[in-house]
Amino acid sequence: MRITWIGAALASALALLAGPLYALQPPATLALACSGPFAKNSSHLKLAMFFDSKNITFTDIKYADGSKVPASVLFPNDQKRRLEVWWSNPTARSNIHLIVIGGQSTWAAPGGLRLGQTLEQVEKLNHKPFKLKGFDEDRIATGSDWDGGALATVAGGCKLGISLRADAKASAEKIDALSVDEEYSSLDPAIRAAKPTVSEIVIGY
């Protein structure tokens, strides 16, 4: 009886070992690092092996201007866990070019960046103020310089970029006064008055 139990337990253990690493080691939080499955030399196959092939697809990402970018998408049917991975070699689906956190995704980027964070929260992660461009026609401002802060250097050799959307209550007049062609400090009173929050995070190699 004991031998039978041990045999069954061993069979179960071997079955687990044959499964994807994500199933064996599910992350406590969806935290992204520029290493492991998200290292520069990763591939669609490596992501499929880590997260399970049923949780990834390769498709064209469509943008409002009509352009398309071929990319691997993790958890395509789960807006909270969705993650886009663009490849330097799209044909081979290898060597990461960009990782995009957008929409309603709850992934945390290196350094603790998350969607929805305020200027003050990003400054705290950076350990100092940073610079950003003014707002475009969609009320989006783009981070332009971490100014030597903590987010300027990330382990693994990747770079962090963010976009911030102005608060819906910020007046069009105040937003238009902050030119997209100009660079501002995150401490600028006019920028802070717009109360922008992080709307997209890009991790690039």
Predicted segments with their positions:
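Short helix/turn-capping signatures at newly exposed starts of structured segments
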Residues: 19-205
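Bacterial N-terminal signal peptides
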Residues: 7-19
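Positively charged n-region of N-terminal signal peptides that target proteins for export
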Residues: 1-5
